[in-house]
Amino acid sequence: MSYQMPQNRTMSHNPYNSSDMPMPSAKEQTLMWQQNSYLGDSGIHSGAVTQVPSLSGKDDDMEDDPLMFDMDQGFSQNFTQDQVDDMNQQLSQTRSQRVRAAMFPETLEEGIEIPSTQFDPQQPTAVQRLSEPSQMLKHAVVNLINYQDDADLATRAIPELIKLLNDEDQVVVSQAAMMVHQLSKKEASRHAIMNSPQMVAALVRALSQSNDLETTKGAVGTLHNLSHHRQGLLAIFKSGGIPALVKLLSSPVESVLFYAITTLHNLLLHQDGSKMAVRLAGGLQKMVALLQRNNVKFLAIVTDCLQILAYGNQESKLIILASTGPSELVRIMRSYDYEKLLWTTSRVLKVLSVCSSNKPAIVEAGGMQALAMHLGNPSQRLVQNCLWTLRNLSDAATKVDGLETLLSGLVTVLGSSDVNVVTCAAGILSNLTCNNQRNKVTVCQVGGVEALVGTIINAGDREEITEPAVCALRHLTSRHPESESAQNIVRNGYGLPVIVKLLNPPSRWPLIKAVIGLIRNLALCPSNAAPLREHGAIHLLVRLLFKAFQDTQRQRSSVATNGSQPPGAYADGVRMEEIVEGTVGALHILSKEELNRQLIRQQNVISIFVQLLFYNDIENIQRVAAGVLCELAVDKEVAEMIEAEGATAPLTELLNSANEGVATYAAAVLFKMSEDKSMDYKKRFSSELTTLPVFRDDTMWNNGELGIGPDLQDILSPDQAYEGLYGQGPPSVHSSHGGRAFQQGYDTLPIDSMQGLEIGGGGNAGPAGSNPNAGNNPGAGGPPSGQPTSPYAMDMDVGEMDASELTFDHLDVMPSPPQDNNQVAAWYDTDL
């Protein structure tokens, strides 16, 4: 399946294959040729008149051939020569009458019968065919005469009608308005009216001042007729007709309302300056009030006016919001099936959905569910508008429940061949599966993982599709009850080679970043470790790590030299530190498998891991670096290589880190490096650990048996919604790229809000906020107010032990990393 525009297909017009038919003889061909219509022509082509033997090929015996036509066979009645002569004479005498009847039938006297020469009613005679142009000319002349008469009449009547419209007697004004309305129905007089500014001004004045219904209907009907011409629109606008028309939007009379709204609609579409005039006259408020009516065609015009007024104008959007417009628009989407009304309404919602104030109002009014009702509509323009609107709303609907129908519909439309439809559907799924376990489970249960894998395979190099689809898969492969199943489905659906391939050029950095996070999640499934290695994931991750590390080193050197951050800190809105952190985190998970560890060791990256320990200003990078070293140090040779790279000093310093995860990983690596050291060294090391703040808690260790706990990378943290780099609409509030300042562990400024944190552990996380401290933070799971904002608050299930008795004398395993994280963690650990 490919996403391409439909192409025209050529079809053969030959209903049979001529090669299958026997070739007739030359004589038969000649006979068949002569049976065609050529015998009825002038003889130029067929030779039927001249019949020169050398040209026609007519033999003497052809007259007796039964295949030849009998020219008289169609006439069953025999006429005598006298009868024929009488008919010819009659036709000759009535020729002029026949011509007159065809061209000027109104000149004939009644009762005269004229013989007809028409044998076939389906075939007009030559005279009849020749009469058509003359009839058209006659009608044109008549119309021209009438047009001139209408124009002359209107021109002479306009001055008098203006006086009557300005009369104090309302009865006179009413009669004059109705008369002008009748004149405006004819084109000539209509042009005369619109070319008279005084007449248009008089109509507007009568409209504004009169309370008489007939006057109002006549005047507004005239303005409606004028509004079909640009000159008429300009005349209405210059005469101040817009405030008068807006006032009529409160009329209880249907015909007046229709005239007023259609005239305003024409003005908004074609007359410059009319939008501002309608806004100033309070038209928006009145139009929103009209949404409560139930005439679908009327509502279609009203909603189209609202779309024109709101597009690109924030003030108009806020006025619609203040007038409870979003709820009325959602009601229309839920209540009607008239395609044009649904389309125009979805256009208004699409415009409003990019407004940060209207967005939550639409979501709260049930906009997501109402728009989902029309994803199966046969109208493609309606479906696309609904999808774009849902895409814009989706980052504000990550906490909304009851979206099962929408999610199922989105999975279905992923199978569309329309690029825009698939792009929107993937982006919406990415946002709605962000930080919402229920939505994740729903999408998995309706076949969303398989559909997304198929979408990525079919998309090829279309990043506008692959990026949101990869982000959605990243969400579905971690931190919910069905995540392990999703990880297996990706492998079984042949998605691994395609996903790994996306790490290669020409993929841009936002897509690469998303793929790194997805690979990290897929590696959580032990069954994926070997296939990922075989498809080259480790080589590609290491290559990206080298590139990103070089860029960050160059940047940091420039900062140290110049004291300012260079422009190259971002690439396509993604900081290279994010790539460093993500690749190291993915390698950490992959290194749990022995063959993967051996391959990583062969990539000459241990020195980079050690250098990353010095990134004191980026705690998350220190954590992932210590984490991967912790896994690699399981092999004694690698532990020696780590020590040879000078890791002892930075690891010792990291023991003092306020980040429990960093400190624990550092302790684990140091412990592994000390395995071949003397017992005195181990005791001294153990004693030093107990003096550190992070290790003073006597519940840190489990009676001397310190088994490796759940991987620290499985610790949960905030989801972050996908912001489509290629889509329309506002940036997602959860965006991690697109030029915004990165705020996950890289900025020196503190994070102001913990909103949106989803806390738990491992691929099968429990519900967010299960931590006892969750009540101190509405984002679920944040630290109590006043405590340090360390990314790793631990919640370990360990036995009791006095810290003074802590010793490494008989330990053959490393310290256990923390098992929970209730604070900000690395982006790749999340649904970023």
UniProtKB/Swiss-Prot annotation:
Q: Which PROSITE patterns match?
A: ARM_REPEAT (PS50176)
GO CC terms, sorted: adherens junction; cytoplasm; plasma membrane
Keyword presence, Cytoplasm: yes
Chain intervals with Low complexity compositional bias: 767-777
**UniProt cross-references to Pfam families, sorted A to Z:** Arm
Query: Which compartments does it reside in?
Result: Cytoplasm; Cell membrane; Cell junction, Adherens junction
The segments labelled Disordered in the record are: 1-24, 721-832
**Chain positions of ARM repeats:** 146-185, 188-228, 230-269, 272-311, 356-395, 397-434, 483-524, 594-634, 636-675
Spell out the SUPFAM superfamilies in the cross-references: ARM repeat (SSF48371)
The way it spans or sits in the membrane comes to: Peripheral membrane protein
Which InterPro entries has this protein been placed in? ARM-like, ARM-type_fold, Armadillo, Beta-catenin
> Some GO term, biological process aspect, for this entry: which one?
canonical Wnt signaling pathway
The name this protein goes by in its record: Armadillo segment polarity protein
Species whose genome carries this gene: Aedes aegypti
Q: Which lineage is the organism of this entry classified under, starting from the top rank? A: Eukaryota, Metazoa, Ecdysozoa, Arthropoda, Hexapoda
UniProt gene name? arm
